């Protein structure tokens, strides 16, 4: 007995009536029939009497598919008439309310049934929270085409996300989800969760056993082998009070070797030789032994001796391997051999096999998950990425949400929330206060009403608060001054009254703020507040602007061509001819004129010479020169100088060795194809250039002609925005748009701008969204040979099929990360929203594109790490911040 206690874990007792009653009442059971319409009554499965409800309230996306033919399928006795499939997005998640710390049997079922008529078995990944559970391959099995995945898992929080993740060209689908609570002291692994390999009971009856015979709805599959003989009894066998409770139909049957001198051997295959496996062996002596009969046998697992064992008479026991097993070559074996004392052969009634699966990534902080999902529910945020864990894995993080992910064992925290231009209505929800680690909160450009709530003072880590361009009322609250880290507050474009509180003014005028650890911060940490203070102040500002405008207008009348600043950049026409070698090499042509190649002080330059036939020539020339003389940004093309002599007008730019983006996407440039990280880098840098025009210039500027031909590429494929002849400035504050004649390029024009002649910075966002579609797809903006000639309509039609490969540029040869590309595509579609108020600003666009690149790099590093781990020695990988062109 001492040896037994050391080598085996023992579970033995009488049958638990209480446990049986609870389970038969389906207490704690969750049974979802996926695809069942919400207006239909719950389905009661006739064989088990289990009640299945529609999954509509547990998942946001997906569509119902109808099984073509299931008349010849008896797949675990479940209904298979409909299913749910997910043609949109990359990750689609079910969100289930569970009890934290509870051990559940979680079962997912996938029955394809050729619902789509394609006869192509789907393949995709299945995630439990932020961790991958398994890769699902729904292939034909035993005359059907179904797969069951089952796991025993202890929930970490009170929300459980089960996610289907698209990995290729096929569409994820699911038929049913089942959760069954288990006793806390059953199925215990030292680490990780337990993935079911098999539940066998030894009989040749052919009968599957499950609920209600099994109180936990385990599915027991009958199993026999040619060298075995089955025995059984009609007498009841006592069960367990501590949790395992095998059904009577399972424990009342057993197998013995037909040749009583031979051992009883059971083998199974592990998925990998590195897998850790637990075996649960069920025994009960079910024969009435004579006085001179004895059944005793040795138990060996993978050739290792464990115990000499005698089954109890009509009383069940479960013997569990005390530590996880590893099976050499992937072949595992349990062998029962009778001892010299035994007169009867060994027997076994049933066996369960589980492999250990690790879920190392911690879920996002529970309180913050609840808060962000309440925010989502309150404002009806319908972003497709807002499913599952908001922070991890990073490639699926929610758009507009940034997190602090320290390591896999520490729950991530939400540190930034950007819901700008998201169509939010109502008051500022109190749920935001539960995101206690927020550093940045952007609720700008919505239709929020009410006062700035006191609950925001609980955001003690907040550095930047943007509430601009809403319909907020009341006074600027004094409590904002108590948020010590707060650096910037944006309040313009609201209906706030009164003056700025003295406490905020004191902080604004203070040369040093007392922050953490009693240290002082420099003046750059002061709070900047932009708010409507009084009608008098506004009136004064308007009068001053009118006065300045009239003076400028008067000055314009006096001087037909006003002199330009920084005359040291002004060149004579003869110098222009000399630097271009008498206009020898043409780089390009446009409505403005011709661009020539030139040299200035042995440096290459591009010289744009204005055509005298250009209708708006000098006006656009003047606009571009004045803009480029006062703005300087690494992602805006630099002006070297200009010529303004009579009718001879020219602009001299820095030379961009690799031409424009469109040449590379179309293949007209020749040479290697831009790879995926290279395209993302170009998109990021272009976005930063536009962002600078919108928020870095004083006054802000709208480019008005963002397109792929106006994105130039340097020697190392660094991107710079060019051609500012159509740019317009707009005022900040209450002014939301500039009324102007429509100008720009067909295909890139914001439909709202085109229809209303209203120009805003969101017009550039729309145009950039078109460029982003070009970058992703490699398709021209307008192509008459396509069924859908306009790239926007074409992209929407392809998205309806949910096939990323059909959308991505074929020249990439599938060499891209699916998660990164889906995120970029979703961002592009957000940018081209017909309503400008629902488009993101360029700051957010640049941020999301950076995340796309981070996701790609992370996936690449993981792949490299996996490859390097297979070889000896150390490998150092350098990740360049300048992706190369291939």
Curated annotation (Swiss-Prot):
Residues the record lists as Phosphotyrosine modifications: 653, 753
Give the chief site where it resides.
membrane
Domain Protein kinase residue range list: 581-850
So what EC number does this one have?
A: 2.7.11.1
Record InterPro entries: Kinase-like_dom_sf, Leu-rich_rpt, LRR_dom_sf, Malectin-like_Carb-bd_dom, Prot_kinase_dom, Protein_kinase_ATP_BS, Ser-Thr/Tyr_kinase_cat_dom, Ser/Thr_kinase_AS
- List the PROSITE patterns hit by this protein, alphabetically: LRR, PROTEIN_KINASE_ATP, PROTEIN_KINASE_DOM, PROTEIN_KINASE_ST
Segments on the Extracellular side according to the record's topology features = 24-528
Q: What does UniProt give as the signal peptide span?
A: 1-23
The entry's localization annotation reads:
Cell membrane
What residue spans carry the region label Disordered? Answer: 863-886
Which leading EC class covers this enzyme? transferase
The UniProt keyword set, sorted, is: ATP-binding, Cell membrane, Glycoprotein, Kinase, Leucine-rich repeat, Membrane, Nucleotide-binding, Phosphoprotein, Receptor, Repeat, Serine/threonine-protein kinase, Signal, Transferase, Transmembrane, Transmembrane helix
Entry membrane topology: Single-pass type I membrane protein
Q: Which residues lie on this side of the membrane: Cytoplasmic?
A: 550-886
In this UniProt entry, the residues modified to Phosphoserine are: 739
The entry's ATP-binding residues are 587-595, 608
CDD domains on file: STKc_IRAK (cd14066)
MF terms (GO), sorted A to Z: ATP binding; protein serine kinase activity; protein serine/threonine kinase activity
Q: Which residues carry this modification: Phosphothreonine?
A: 740, 745
Where exactly are the transmembrane stretches of this chain?
529-549
The record's section on Pfam families has: LRR_8 (PF13855), Malectin_like (PF12819), PK_Tyr_Ser-Thr (PF07714)
GO (cellular component) term, any one? plasma membrane
Q: Which reaction does it catalyse?
A: L-seryl-[protein] + ATP = O-phospho-L-seryl-[protein] + ADP + H(+); L-threonyl-[protein] + ATP = O-phospho-L-threonyl-[protein] + ADP + H(+)
Q: Where is the composition biased (Polar residues)?
A: 865-878
The family note in this entry says:
Belongs to the protein kinase superfamily. Ser/Thr protein kinase family.
Task: Report the protein name in the record.
Answer: Putative leucine-rich repeat receptor-like serine/threonine-protein kinase At2g14440
Say which species the protein is native to. Arabidopsis thaliana (Mouse-ear cress)
Lineage, broadest ranks: Eukaryota, Viridiplantae, Streptophyta, Embryophyta, Tracheophyta
């Amino acid at each position: 007995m001492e040896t037994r206690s050391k080598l085996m874990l023992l579970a033995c007792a009488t049958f638990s009536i209480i446990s049986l009653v609870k389970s038969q009442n389906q207490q704690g059971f969750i049974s979802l029939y996926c695809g069942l319409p919400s207006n239909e009554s719950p389905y009661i499965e006739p064989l088990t009497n289990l009640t299945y409800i529609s999954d509509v309230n547990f998942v946001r996306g997906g569509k119902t598919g109808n099984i073509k033919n299931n008349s010849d399928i008896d797949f675990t006795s479940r209904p298979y008439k409909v299913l749910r499939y997910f043609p949109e997005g990359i990750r689609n998640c079910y969100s289930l309310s569970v009890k934290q710390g509870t051990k559940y049997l979680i079962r997912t079922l996938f029955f394809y049934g050729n619902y789509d008529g394609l006869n192509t078995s789907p393949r995709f990944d299945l995630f439990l929270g932020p961790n991958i559970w398994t890769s699902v391959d729904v292939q034909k099995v035993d005359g059907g085409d179904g797969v069951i995945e089952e796991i025993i898992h202890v929930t970490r929080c009170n929300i459980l996300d089960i996610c289907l993740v698209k990995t290729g060209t096929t569409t994820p689908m699911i038929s049913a989800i089942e959760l069954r609570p288990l006793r806390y002291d059953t199925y215990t692994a030292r680490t990780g969760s337990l993935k079911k390999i098999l539940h066998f009971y030894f009989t040749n009856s052919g009968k599957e056993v499950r609920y209600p015979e099994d109180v936990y709805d385990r599915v027991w599959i009958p199993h026999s082998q040619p060298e075995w003989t089955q025995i059984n009894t009609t007498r009841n066998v006592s069960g367990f009070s501590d949790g395992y409770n095998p059904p009577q139909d399972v424990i009342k049957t057993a197998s013995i070797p037909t040749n009583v001198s031979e051992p009883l051997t059971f083998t199974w295959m592990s998925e990998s030789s590195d897998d850790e496996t637990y075996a649960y062996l069920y025994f009960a002596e079910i024969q009435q032994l004579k006085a001179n009969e004895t059944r005793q046998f040795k138990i060996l697992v993978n050739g290792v001796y464990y115990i000499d064992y005698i089954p109890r008479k009509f009383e069940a026991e479960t013997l569990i391997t005390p530590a996880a097993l590893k099976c050499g070559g992937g072949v595992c074996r349990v062998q029962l051999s009778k001892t010299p004392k035994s007169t009867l052969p060994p027997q076994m009634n049933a066996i369960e096999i589980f492999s250990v699966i690790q879920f190392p990534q911690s879920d996002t902080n529970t309180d913050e998950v609840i808060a962000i999902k309440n925010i989502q529910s309150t404002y009806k945020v319908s972003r497709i990425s807002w499913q599952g864990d908001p922070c991890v894995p990073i490639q699926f993080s929610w758009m507009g949400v940034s997190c602090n992910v320290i390591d896999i064992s520490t729950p991530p925290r939400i540190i930034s929330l950007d819901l700008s231009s998201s169509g939010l209505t109502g008051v500022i929800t109190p749920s935001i206060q539960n995101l206690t680690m927020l550093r940045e909160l952007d609720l700008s450009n919505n239709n929020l009403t009410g006062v700035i709530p006191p609950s925001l003072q609980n955001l003690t880590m907040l550095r930047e608060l943007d509430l601009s361009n809403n319909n907020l009322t009341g006074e600027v609250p004094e409590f904002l001054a108590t948020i010590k880290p707060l650096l910037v507050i944006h309040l313009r474009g609201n209906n706030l009254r009164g003056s700025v509180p003295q406490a905020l003014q004191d902080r604004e005028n203070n040369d040093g703020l007392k922050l953490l650890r009693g240290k002082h911060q420099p003046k750059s940490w002061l709070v900047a507040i932009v708010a409507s203070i009084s009608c008098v102040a506004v009136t004064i500002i308007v009068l001053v602007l009118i006065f300045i405008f009239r003076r400028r207008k008067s000055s314009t009348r006096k001087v037909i061509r006003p002199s330009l600043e920084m005359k040291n950049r002004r060149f004579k026409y003869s110098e222009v001819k000399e630097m271009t070698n008498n206009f020898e090499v043409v780089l390009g042509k446009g409505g403005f004129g011709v661009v020539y190649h030139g040299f200035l002080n042995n440096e290459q330059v591009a010289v744009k010479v204005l055509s005298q036939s250009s209708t708006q020539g000098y006006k656009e020339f003047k606009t571009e020169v004045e803009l480029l003389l006062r703005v300087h940004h690494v992602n805006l093309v630099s002006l070297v100088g200009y010529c303004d002599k009579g009718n001879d007008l020219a602009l001299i730019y820095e030379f961009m060795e690799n031409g424009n983006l469109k040449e590379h996407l179309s293949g007209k440039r020749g040479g290697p194809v831009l790879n995926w990280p290279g395209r993302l880098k170009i998109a990021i840098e272009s976005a930063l250039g536009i962002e600078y025009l919108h928020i870095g210039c004083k006054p802000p500027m709208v480019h008005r002609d963002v397109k792929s031909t106006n994105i130039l590429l340097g020697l190392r494929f660094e991107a710079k925005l060019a051609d500012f002849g159509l740019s317009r400035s707009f005022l900040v504050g209450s002014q939301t748009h500039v009324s102007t004649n429509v100008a720009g390029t067909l295909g890139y024009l914001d439909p709202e701008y085109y229809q209303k002649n209203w120009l805003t910075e969101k017009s550039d966002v729309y145009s950039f969204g078109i460029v982003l579609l070009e970058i992703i797809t490699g398709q021209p903006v307008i192509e008459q040979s396509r069924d859908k000639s306009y790239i926007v309509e074409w992209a929407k039609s392809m998205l309806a099929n949910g096939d990323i490969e059909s959308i991505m540029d074929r020249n990439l040869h599938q060499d891209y990360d699916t998660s990164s590309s889906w995120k970029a595509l979703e961002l592009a579609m957000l940018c081209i929203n017909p309503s400008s108020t629902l488009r993101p600003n360029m700051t957010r666009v640049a941020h999301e594109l950076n995340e796309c690149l981070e996701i790609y790099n992370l996936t690449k590093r993981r792949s490299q790490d996996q490859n390097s781990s297979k070889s000896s020695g150390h490998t150092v990988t350098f990740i360049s911040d300048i992706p190369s062109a291939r």
